[in-house]
């Protein structure tokens, strides 16, 4: 509710993944508590898994109710309380999750739900002596600000706070010339445009060999022509409104840069309408320059930028992909050539924390694909695994 999600995206998030996090985090906690050191004859060694000394500040984004479930449940299962600041653009859905917790019997004061101004709340919370940690999902800029505030207040705290964060990405799809064009096109469309591209894992840039481009392009354009854009109440609408006017304006500013540049061409979409809601057409940009701004910067909207490379420059373009963006969250390689898959995996080892073969870079499942990346994408603490609870 209030997130601009159609029924299909809502079911994936606010039903299935919420339940998965609750169930799996309980299971992961039990594994952690059972892990004990060996004891020699006549002695007993024991690990006491004590909570951090204080409370955890959890800051959750607008795009996934499930993330709020994970950030709070992982903390309280390990014995800490939370001060929970939900995104101001998704208060309603998070409020209902809080009410469900209370109806289920969660004691008062375990999760403390505090919607409001992020800067005002953080200014109080991050100066508190009992702050023991921060569990964050959101923008890179906000995370950097919080980290700096924590650093500036180190003399205040009882202990060094543990900081865990996931901060977005500039996620890629990379195709080798042995790739299957229809599979590749499907990954581009679904990976870039589901939930209007408002996923940390959403595909935002693609590298396609020249020999594969025309047939892939025809599939992509056909699929986009069949996409309907509109209100979430009409289940025929695959693409719905972006979260707010600020997001709309930011997305359209990137599209405008492509419209006015001789280094890029828009081959699909490119229009937006905020007369009633904030709707942006699924947009595909072909960049002549691999360092064009929409290839490098996170947009967080339904915009995919494609760079077409010469087939004989596969390894050179892999290196280009690795070095183009400061992020390192998700990515995928499409190839039927095992050597190419292995080569891509080695070159792009640090370019993605979640790396997929012949699949779109979105849709990590709790317990199956632990989620998180490094570089500017965060601390790589792998949500959906026991590592996120430690």
What are the functions of these language-model segments?
Residues 3-33, 46-47:
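Long amphipathic alpha-helix in the N-terminal Rossmann-like dinucleotide-binding domain
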Residues 100-105, 127-128, 133, 140-290, ...:
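ALDH superfamily catalytic-core signature
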Residues 2, 10, 25, 59, ...:
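Generic beta-strand/beta-sheet core signal
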Residues 22, 56-59, 79, 111, ...:
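Buried hydrophobic positions in well-ordered alpha/beta secondary-structure cores of metabolic enzymes
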Residues 31-183, 380:
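Rossmann-like NAD(P) dinucleotide-binding subdomain of oxidoreductase/dehydrogenase enzymes
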Residues 42-45, 269-275, 361-362:
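Short, solvent-exposed loop/turn elements at beta->coil junctions and helix N-caps
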Residues 106, 130-131, 186, 222-228, ...:
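Conserved C-terminal structural/oligomerization subdomain of aldehyde/semialdehyde dehydrogenase
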Residues 82-84, 170-174, 201, 205, ...:
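Short beta-alpha connecting loops at secondary-structure transitions
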């Amino acid at each position: 509710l209030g997130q601009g999600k159609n029924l299909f995206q809502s079911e994936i998030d606010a039903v299935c993944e919420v339940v998965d996090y609750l169930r799996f985090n309980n299971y992961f906690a039990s594994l952690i508590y059972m892990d004990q050191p060996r004891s020699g004859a006549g002695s007993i060694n024991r690990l006491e898994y004590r909570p951090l000394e204080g409370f955890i500040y959890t800051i959750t984004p607008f795009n996934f109710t499930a993330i709020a479930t994970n950030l709070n449940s992982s903390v309280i299962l390990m014995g800490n309380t939370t001060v929970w600041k939900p995104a101001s653009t998704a208060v309603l859905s998070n409020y209902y999750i809080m009410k469900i917790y209370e109806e289920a019997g969660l004691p008062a004061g375990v999760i403390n739900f505090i919607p409001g101004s992020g800067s005002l709340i953080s200014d109080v919370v991050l100066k508190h002596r009992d702050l023991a940690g921060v569990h964050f999902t959101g923008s890179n800029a906000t995370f950097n600000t919080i980290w700096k505030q924590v650093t500036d207040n180190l003399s205040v705290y009882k202990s060094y706070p543990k900081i865990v964060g996931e901060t977005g990405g500039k996620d890629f799809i990379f195709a080798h010339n042995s790739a299957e064009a229809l599979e590749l096109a499907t990954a581009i469309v679904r990976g870039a445009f589901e939930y209007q591209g408002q996923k940390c894992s959403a595909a935002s840039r693609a590298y396609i060999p020249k020999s594969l481009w025309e047939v892939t392009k025809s599939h992509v354009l056909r699929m986009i022509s069949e996409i309907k854009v509109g209100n979430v109440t009409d289940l025929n609408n695959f693409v719905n409104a972006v979260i707010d006017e600020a997001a709309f304006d930011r997305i359209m500013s990137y599209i405008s840069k492509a419209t006015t540049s001789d280094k890029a061409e828009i081959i699909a979409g490119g229009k937006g309408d905020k007369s009633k809601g904030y709707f942006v057409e699924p947009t595909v940009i072909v960049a002549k320059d691999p360092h064009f701004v929409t290839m490098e910067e996170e947009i967080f909207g339904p915009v995919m930028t494609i760079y077409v490379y010469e087939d004989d420059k596969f390894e050179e373009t892999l290196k280009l992909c690795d070095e183009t963006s400061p992020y390192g969250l998700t990515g995928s390689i499409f190839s039927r050539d095992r050597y190419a898959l292995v080569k891509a995996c080695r070159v792009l080892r640090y370019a993605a924390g979640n790396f997929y073969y012949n699949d779109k870079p979105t849709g990590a499942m709790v317990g199956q694909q632990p989620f998180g990346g490094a570089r500017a994408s965060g601390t790589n603490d792998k949500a959906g695994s026991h590592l996120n609870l430690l």
